[in-house]
């Protein structure tokens, strides 16, 4: 009986990890001078290793997702270009 309870608890723990929502981390930067805005990415495909393209006041950068909301994913689109944006 104890092994069944353990198996159920283990399964629930695994599912909560797999099914938990993921978000871009909240940026610690609140403002940026226009001449310092630089996009390292425009979409998630521009990032490596499972990181996402996240929008910050200083441009889009690749960051690993977190389980805490607050950040914003980059919108991308045809007008998005990598490099300095000015």
UniProtKB/Swiss-Prot annotation:
Keywords of this entry: Antibiotic, Antimicrobial, Disulfide bond, Secreted, Signal, Toxin
Post-translational modification: Contains 5 disulfide bonds.
Domain WAP: 21-66
Tissue expression profile of the protein: Expressed by the venom gland.
Localization terms from the record: Secreted
Disulfide-bonded cysteines: 24-54, 32-58, 41-53, 42-80, 47-62
Domain of life: Eukaryota
InterPro entries, A to Z: Elafin-like_sf
GO molecular function: toxin activity
Record keyword Signal present: yes
UniProt signal peptide: 1-20
Protein's GO biological process: defense response to bacterium
UniProt GO cellular component terms: extracellular region
Family membership noted in the UniProt record: Belongs to the venom protein 11 family. 01 (wap-1) subfamily.
Job of this protein: Has antibacterial activity.
Name the UniProt record assigns to this protein: U15-lycotoxin-Ls1c
Native source species: Lycosa singoriensis (Wolf spider)
Classification lineage: Eukaryota, Metazoa, Ecdysozoa, Arthropoda, Chelicerata
């Amino acid at each position: 009986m104890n092994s069944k309870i353990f198996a159920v608890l283990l399964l629930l723990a695994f599912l909560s990890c797999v099914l938990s929502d993921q978000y871009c981390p909240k940026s610690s930067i609140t403002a940026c001078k226009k001449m310092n805005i630089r996009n390292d990415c425009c979409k998630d495909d521009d990032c490596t290793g499972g990181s996402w393209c996240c929008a910050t006041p200083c441009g889009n950068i690749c960051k690993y997702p977190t389980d805490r909301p607050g950040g914003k994913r980059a919108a991308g689109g045809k007008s998005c270009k990598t490099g300095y944006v000015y």
